[in-house]
Amino acid sequence: MADDGMLLNFSIPETGILSRPSLKGGNWRDRAAAKKAAQNWHTKASARLTGEKVDKVAKKTVENATDVNRTQLGQRTRRASKSPEVHEDIDRPAKRARVSGDFRPKSNEKSAAEAGDYRPQINPGATQKPSERQSAPKGAKGGKQVISSLFTYNPTSTTKTQAPEKRHDEEPIEPSNAPLSSELDTFTSLGISTTLAAHLLKKMDLKAPTAIQKAAITQLVKDDSDAFIQAETGSGKTLAYLLPIVQRLMELSANMKKHKDDDAVQRNSGLFAIIMAPTRELSKQIALVLEKLLGCAHWLVATTVIGGEKKKSEKARLRKGINILVATPGRLADHLEHTEALDVSNVRWLVLDEGDRLMELGFEQEIQKIVGALNLRMRGNKTRIPGLPDKRTTVLCSATMKMDVERLGQISLKDAVHLRADPTEREQEGDEPQDERSYAPAQLKQSYAVVAPKLRLVSLIAYLKRAFTRKGSVMKAIVFVSCADSVDFHFDILTSNLEEKNEKAEGTKDDTEEKADDDEPKKSTKKPKAIPQADPTKLSVTHAESPVLSPKSHAVTAYRLHGSLQQSLRTSTLAHFTKNNDAAVLIATDVASRGLDLPNVDLVVEFDPAFAREDHLHRIGRTARAGRDGRACIFLMPGPEEGYVDILKTDRKDNEAGITITRQDADDILTRGLVTSGIATKNAYMDIAQDLQLNVERWALASPARLESARRAFQSHIRAYATHVADERKYFDIKSLHLGHLAKAFALRERPSGMKAPGLRTGAGRNDRTPAKIRGANAAKIGSAPAAKKAVDLDIPDAKDTEEAAKMRKAVRAREKFMRHAGMADEFNLG
């Protein structure tokens, strides 16, 4: 070296020379894991050589790397610059090594914190010992927990927020489903008797008919032809077909009394009308309206036969005699086959309510069987009853004219008259329909909220808190979600006290206040107190006070409703929600979207968009009924879902095009709902929302049952997301979902790919609550019994439900097969 005139000065660092392995080949995930392991080994080896602590060595390594980059870049800048105006002491901004996804230079850390930037600076557990890292609480078995901020790396909206146009000459919107205001349009002018009209006014507070009631009553009272009633939700279709039936039966009874004083229509006179509805809840509601209507004709008797009830008690009521029957198709077909006391030879009216839903639920075969049985038994009875139609009159009610509804009309209708709200639109069957679409009520105020996946949960809570802030501003609200598991999860959150100190999981701290400490934290020897919380897998409580939503001035009651609840619980929940005169919120699936007339519902929130446009219209139709005002809001995520706004705009008729659908952002919702008092800073809502999210996550981690409920809700939500109709799947593409961000909306800190799939909910897919031993004994008896005796003696209320469950399982298996071929089996754990 010296012979060449060169002198090299090697400076060996204090830590010595440690070899760094070169990682090549293999998968990029394996290389990243090996690189991280080598870096941790190098840090610990340096700490052993210098005697310093691990975190200090890691910090020094980052600073040295930053200094080297600054020197090299500064020298390179000075060499490249030839201008004398450039000062040599001005270097290029420092370039720091990227650590844990931090893209900002070190010099900007302070300004970012002051500006309210919540992006993570450095991974607090990257240089900690295993004993110093945050341990997973009990019940959180599985993958590594990820605690991320709500306001980092959220997708940006693809549409721009437009300020609403102010129209000074805007006229008030007239309700499209309100009762007619003309003095000439009364029930008596339509052919209703004064006795029945007075009863409607005094007992039911109905002064005038709606447009669809006027068209239907005029036709059905005077004519015996079949009819197809098409009208928007909340327009009074139930009374449109009930009033003509009751009026004709009252006239029949009056005519019979004229000939014989003791002769009149009684319960043993025969069954004259059958009303079929797709769901049990709608059947119960129709029966309730019919019971009020028959208050002026006490000699007429009506009853219901629906799934989930005891067949023995239903048979007893049928033996006593009835005049009007409200039923679901599956149970009615079963009684027609096995109950001899059910005589349908005198049936003169058959009503199919919500015809589109009847076909969607797969009741086509049952309806064909019922219509065939009615035709066969009516031919056998050739006795003519004066005052009744000579043939059976069939009435089909539906909000849309889809292909399946037309097929149902071909099965049941013959020479039907098409009735609409506008009498000028009446048309005979076979004419080309003028408009096959259905629309939302004109007075309904619609809006949509663009909310990032991570902000969905806190935004929903903030939106509802804002709605119930003032007493009387919103009496009742309905929140629609996609699946039953999601209903249970959100109900448990709203009815829990998230701010209780004893609900923190063992080993967790306030994540926003955790600081790195040199000493190891002392392990607590105290066991956490038992939390008096019911198992969320047991569906026994369906309503409770909501501490999360209740302001100081009044309490808010939360309810839940879905198809997996027992029929008795579903009925009692709806009854309690209907009779409650205080503020209340109902979290439900689409089981509450069809035909239910729930009073004082001022707000409908579609937290999960409906699977089809028709379901969306039925959801928002739970408010703004019978001329009342109402509001509806749908939550959409940034990206393809924002294109769904074009579908929302088709909810209005052409003459209502001036009515705009307003937009809301997550920032506005959180600010209005969470920042309630005092002078708040610009980003104050971020701190409150972050604390609320952490409270929900700690609440979920505090109990294995809650954590299982959250996982089940997340996975069921993903499966339901993949079931949108083909025409709308471009807006709801499951491949565009960020599963990790969406998991945070379900209070989960685990990676979706490492999440274990829990089992089915208690009783899911099966309504029989008998023990397994008894079910096995009954199955053995069934196998040895004759076929004829099996059909008559067995009381199996869920026979039809089992068949429907089999159809649903077949559809789910087909969906799972599609997901596996699409490469999504790892996220859903379906393989």
From Swiss-Prot:
SUPFAM superfamilies: P-loop containing nucleoside triphosphate hydrolases
Domain of life per record: Eukaryota
Protein residues bound to ATP: 231-238
Top EC class for this record: hydrolase
PROSITE patterns for this protein: HELICASE_ATP_BIND_1 (PS51192), HELICASE_CTER (PS51194), Q_MOTIF (PS51195)
Subcellular location: Nucleus, Nucleolus
Main localization of the protein described in the UniProt heading: nucleus
Biased composition (Basic and acidic residues): 82-112, 501-512
Sequence motif: DEAD box, positions: 353-356
Gene behind this protein: DBP7
Chain positions covered by the region annotation Disordered: 65-180, 419-441, 501-543
UniProt name for this protein: ATP-dependent RNA helicase DBP7
The record's note on its domains: The Q motif is unique to and characteristic of the DEAD box family of RNA helicases and controls ATP binding and hydrolysis.
Catalytic activity: ATP + H2O = ADP + phosphate + H(+)
InterPro entries: DEAD/DEAH_box_helicase_dom, Helicase_ATP-bd, Helicase_C-like, P-loop_NTPase, SPB4-like_CTE
E.C. code: 3.6.4.13
Pfam families: CTE_SPB4, DEAD, Helicase_C
Function of the protein: ATP-binding RNA helicase involved in the biogenesis of 60S ribosomal subunits and is required for the normal formation of 25S and 5.8S rRNAs.
Positions of short motif Q motif: 185-214
GO CC aspect terms: nucleolus
Family, similarity comment: Belongs to the DEAD box helicase family. DDX31/DBP7 subfamily.
Domain Helicase ATP-binding as annotated: residue spans: 218-419
Helicase C-terminal domain mapped to chain residues: 456-670
A GO molecular-function descriptor: ATP binding
Compositionally skewed regions (Polar residues) per UniProt: 65-75, 146-162
